[in-house]
Amino acid sequence: MLLLLGLCLGLSLCVGSQEEAQSWGHSSEQDGLRVPRQVRLLQRLKTKPLMTEFSVKSTIISRYAFTTVSCRMLNRASEDQDIEFQMQIPAAAFITNFTMLIGDKVYQGEITEREKKSGDRVKEKRNKTTEENGEKGTEIFRASAVIPSKDKAAFFLSYEELLQRRLGKYEHSISVRPQQLSGRLSVDVNILESAGIASLEVLPLHNSRQRGSGRGEDDSGPPPSTVINQNETFANIIFKPTVVQQARIAQNGILGDFIIRYDVNREQSIGDIQVLNGYFVHYFAPKDLPPLPKNVVFVLDSSASMVGTKLRQTKDALFTILHDLRPQDRFSIIGFSNRIKVWKDHLISVTPDSIRDGKVYIHHMSPTGGTDINGALQRAIRLLNKYVAHSGIGDRSVSLIVFLTDGKPTVGETHTLKILNNTREAARGQVCIFTIGIGNDVDFRLLEKLSLENCGLTRRVHEEEDAGSQLIGFYDEIRTPLLSDIRIDYPPSSVVQATKTLFPNYFNGSEIIIAGKLVDRKLDHLHVEVTASNSKKFIILKTDVPVRPQKAGKDVTGSPRPGGDGEGDTNHIERLWSYLTTKELLSSWLQSDDEPEKERLRQRAQALAVSYRFLTPFTSMKLRGPVPRMDGLEEAHGMSAAMGPEPVVQSVRGAGTQPGPLLKKPYQPRIKISKTSVDGDPHFVVDFPLSRLTVCFNIDGQPGDILRLVSDHRDSGVTVNGELIGAPAPPNGHKKQRTYLRTITILINKPERSYLEITPSRVILDGGDRLVLPCNQSVVVGSWGLEVSVSANANVTVTIQGSIAFVILIHLYKKPAPFQRHHLGFYIANSEGLSSNCHGLLGQFLNQDARLTEDPAGPSQNLTHPLLLQVGEGPEAVLTVKGHQVPVVWKQRKIYNGEEQIDCWFARNNAAKLIDGEYKDYLAFHPFDTGMTLGQGMSREL
């Protein structure tokens, strides 16, 4: 969708000034002394606004991507100037937020229902020209405004998309085209896949129109300055080129697309099912199946407009494709202009001779005449139907048409609705049509509807692109059908509002995705049935997938929760469901010719899009403003409506898996994993990755106690304290009272002194200027190496100097019980920057190791692998840590908002012998107390 945001903020005519000419520096003046006066006047160029920052942050959680673009500009001129922000976004993405800061005014985007009459500042325009429509598979978002003299402006754009699997890989593409060199340019991508990341690659920068089929390309490595940190389930990719590196790539600031490709591990044939807060998503991508035979007719436009390069490239591509056909396949070729020319009047078996003859036929095709799209499609469908009718019921195969044209129907039937109706009636759902449109004159809407209505896909090839390589790449996606007539069923008593569950074909390297709502959140199992046909037989897969809380993963996406009926924290699976449902409603609306039905679909799609803040053809964006800015916001660096911080989600695949999607620096053996945490009542978890052990303990404190969690004030300058709040114990519980973390305070002493106070409702940042951030709004602020990312009602991520990161979970209750309190959880996501002298209830273990020994009373089995133990009373053992012998017992503990279950060795009695000193030694006098404690003193003696 192409958006042109023309903000009527007082347009003015901008002319050059003496001050602008001087901004080019003394060297320009010295050069001017050597040239005549009239030439020197021409050199006094107008100073355009300077882009001081261009940054993109993207988080992919189980294929669902949240992306936020931040752009800051400065008007160095002495007069007001027009500025424009533009960003290419994937065509499949939905814009969810746009915010603009002009001087001291904030303009906040709001998604509303589209009205026929619009007097708003936001104007939308769709232009099908190559210049306006961006690169292949993208659309351009534009916003323009006037920036006052010597003032600043900032733009923040957020969008979401579900990554599609093609050729065995998910591809995430980010446009890096700031239009000028920027002193602060960065792309930061986090990938979290609980199934495990099987492969990951970063491609060289591309301009999309230069990209081809993907065969044998992209082997020159990632762009310069790219850093990749990866472990089993998490990857962080950072692209941060200097100005010099940017200039070497493109001096005009149009660097190209930053592309990441990856795939995930797959275990069960039934697929990967993830559940969260009453929503589920089912990823189905079976492998190791024999390919289905395919019956394919290649329909090639040979009208006069195809003369020259387009026809030559297409012929070369078909030569390659014919050699890829399998012996069990059957094929034919049709060329069409104002006449329909069929190579053979029946489908031909694949043999060396038939491939040779087909290539000869293609070679002799010559461009002439008009374009009879209807006649060509009818002839191709008749060929396929004739073969299927005579092949017998035992012949399981897939019938496909690959249709390529560069124009509109000009001969025969030219009425679009008639062509669509004729094709639909002839195909009868038995033939899938895959269309490719070349150039600017093609009727792409017709091709799109032909594919949508006939179980196919469509691709657009721009005029400057290599049509042949695009055809090969498109064919590669459909060259290997593995299943047909796929149906995935769930019990109606368990699942409602599921997305599409019927699929005509499944091609190797792709993926089927279904999402829906669970009727009962406490459901023990989700029954799944998959029926399909492959080359040999009819397949039925049935299984009950456990969805118990201890088997499910808890996610903290940080994306706003604008709708839905779930409780608790934000849910990326819910947003994935809303994304898929909206897409399917839009597709159904596009296919429908019945006006009442179209209106019903439009209303449903519109209501859902407004609820989840998706910008669609049925919604519009209005900028509300100006509104007051929060104190100190103007100087905050990196502010954005970021969606998707560091979450954790676990797949439901019939067996529990260990969470661990945390940052790992390459070539460094020590890993700081975010299981190291304090959460709940309060429950402490310490991970020892080198020993493959997790240890847990409780601290039974008193309301008002301030616990020192991390103490590294002297070295890294970081101190973290947590204040407890009391609550009554649940009925029939063994405790007299509960305590939770009410407030987390963080003191950073280097390089500049900053104070952070975090509660479930707000974040206070005091680093000279006091800044108050509400926790119900997503925002990112930063300065002096400190970044604070608030994800609405979900979590707060604090990053210090890029080497220390804490994630504070926000636990809110819609209707809290008497024993429940809004509270916080504290997780150490990255401890690389903390020193070896770090102490505190959690900090003292960050640089320690531990080992397990047998209990003196008798041997224990599988002590380092408690997952292998039988469920029941946990065995006891002795833990050796920091020279102490600590009795422990195996337990299971819930973390990440109480939904994910881990196995750990539990130390009783307020962690006696496990921690240095005793519990009272870790009590601080006030929230920002950094004074030396007994524990800290002992830590320096160890």
UniProtKB/Swiss-Prot annotation:
GO terms for biological process: hyaluronan metabolic process. Belongs to the ITIH family. Induction: Down-regulated in breast tumors. Residues 116-136, 208-227, 550-571 are annotated as: Disordered. Keywords: Glycoprotein, Protease inhibitor, Secreted, Serine protease inhibitor, Signal. Residues 295-478 form the VWFA domain. This is Inter-alpha-trypsin inhibitor heavy chain H5. It comes from Homo sapiens. Residues 35-161 form the VIT domain. Glycans are attached at residues 97, 127, 231, 421, 508, 776, 795, 862.
